[in-house]
Regions:
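C-terminal lid/capping helical subdomain adjacent to the catalytic/cofactor pocket in oxidative enzymes
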Residues: 389-437
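Conserved Rossmann-like nucleotide-cofactor binding loop
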Residues: 18, 38, 266
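Active-site/ligand-binding neighborhood in enzyme catalytic cores
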Residues: 94, 105, 111-112, 116-244
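Acidic, glycine-rich loop-and-beta core segments that form the ion-binding/anion-interacting portion
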Residues: 230-272
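Beta1/beta-strand and adjacent pyrophosphate-binding region of the FAD-binding site
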Residues: 4-18
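Dinucleotide-binding Rossmann-like beta1-alpha1 core, especially the glycine-rich loop
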Residues: 49-130
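Glycine-rich FAD pyrophosphate-binding loop
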Residues: 13, 27-48
Length: 437
């Protein structure tokens, strides 16, 4: 295999945002392995017939001062749009503002009453006392505890059942975190009366590139990689942790001194040959697949939004994005684009989903099916981590095994969590700093 590998030489598995951020922080002495023909992971953009589509919606939020400065002054300098979120919910024939729990105004009076009464009972009344005083068993109880029965029945339970493909009783209570806004009573009441101030939730404002789609971000980071090695088309087939080698699908073996792993943590089940308990734990790491139907159509008016949520069963999709509403440059003049998202637990025939998407958007007045220019789809096999009751223990066991062999995990999928693009960048940076510590 040639000369011995320096102990400091790092192999980075995966060229998404976390891997790129790690490589940038290291500066040199790394080999980044990316299976695809370009870096970026899921933060990539494709153009077809004048329409640009990201690999599902990617909106950039930068809370960390260092990352914010890098984005503004280096990676996307002069190429940033600051966008105020326009997100809606469609239910019971009405369009309401997102988050649902902050914006009941416009829904049927009975629904508003259900949600208000349920919220008060859950957070301050006697009916909710039991959940307030004991540990929560599952995500359904998390919702009941923090939002009440009305919000649970009318939005939270059906929407999350559609998104995660399993009942909320099968999910652990840890899944909510900072991504589910929990309003005060005053906020709920103001939202019911139509005087909510707006801006609730972690993504009320965001950045998006003026040109190049979201792929402009990983390209900007990659431009900083002036030393080190980036290898494209390098698909990892196996890991030899004891021998500190990565084997590629081509059969080539690449030795390393240190390894940063940003691939899906669940892939450990196929990449390692043991020990059995770790393989079994990795197999317990479940995820949801997403098929995105991308539609380009003549502009016909209709409701304006960046994205909208659909909790009702009559729509098989859980969310519809409109990229051209975020940045008109993502569609030809006189056209509008949509990304219709369907979650599923295994292989699925996308053609019926595409037909359903076009028919539904026609019904909603968002497009005219006779004036559709483009329909295509892509499937993301590992899209959302499933926070089921095995998640925490299985994740901890697999990560602990990797750490015992000097492997650092990074990114949304390496850490097996639900996180943002900024979180992925921070995770890669922190992994590099941990290697140097």
């Amino acid at each position: 295999m040639g000369a011995a590998v320096p102990p400091s030489h790092t192999v980075i598995a995966g060229g998404g945002l976390a891997g790129l951020s790690c490589a940038r922080e290291l500066g040199s002495g790394f080999t980044l392995l990316e299976a695809e023909d370009r870096v970026g992971g899921l933060a990539r953009t494709e153009m077809v017939q004048g329409f640009s589509f990201d690999f599902t919606g990617h909106w950039l939020h930068a809370r960390d001062a260092e990352i914010r400065a890098l984005v503004e002054e280096r990676w996307l300098r002069g190429n940033l749009l600051a966008v105020e979120r326009r997100a809606l919910v469609h239910s019971e024939g009405a369009w309401t503002e997102f988050p649902y729990q902050h914006n009941l105004h416009g829904l049927p009076a009975r629904t508003v009453a259900d949600c208000l009464i349920g919220f008060v009972q859950a957070t301050a009344g006697e009916p909710g006392r039991a959940l307030r005083e004991r540990p929560l068993r599952d995500a359904a109880e998390f919702i009941q505890r923090h939002l009440g029965d009305g919000f649970a029945r009318h939005f939270m339970l059906p929407y999350n059942r559609k998104l995660f493909t399993v009942p909320c009783e099968e999910l652990s209570p840890e899944w909510g975190g900072r991504f589910i806004p929990r309003p005060t009573l005053e906020e709920v009441v103001r939202g019911a009366l139509g005087i909510a101030p707006g801006g609730a939730g972690y993504n009320a404002t965001f950045w998006y590139p003026r040109e190049g789609g979201i792929e402009a971000l990983p390209r900007g980071i990659a431009a900083d990689l002036t030393t080190g090695e980036v290898r494209l088309g390098a698909r990892i087939a196996a890991l030899d942790l004891a021998g500190r080698r990565v084997r590629l699908a081509s059969g080539e073996e690449i030795p390393y001194g240190q390894l940063v792993f940003t691939l899906p943590l669940s892939s450990v089940a196929r990449l390692l040959d043991g020990p059995p308990d770790v393989i079994e734990a990795a197999r317990k790491l479940r995820s949801v697949s997403v098929t995105v139907v991308e539609i380009g159509a003549d502009e016909v008016g209709g409701k304006r939004f960046h994205w909208a949520y659909f909790p009702e069963d009559r729509f098989r999709f859980y969310r519809v994005g409109s990229p051209s509403e975020v940045n008109p440059g993502l569609a030809p003049e006189g056209a509008r684009s949509f990304a219709v998202e369907f979650s599923h637990g295994g292989p699925i025939d996308p053609a019926p989903l595409a037909a359903h998407a076009v028919a539904s958007l026609h019904e909603l007045g968002l497009l005219d099916r006779a004036r559709v220019r483009l329909v295509r789809w892509r499937t993301i096999p590992v899209a959302y981590v499933l926070f089921d009751h095995d998640h925490a223990a299985a994740r901890a066991q697999v990560i602990a095994h990797l750490r015992r062999h000097g492997v650092h995990v990074a990114g949304r999928y390496g850490n097996w969590e639900y996180s943002s693009m900024e979180d992925a960048i921070l995770s890669g940076r922190d992994a590099a700093r941990a290697l140097a510590a």
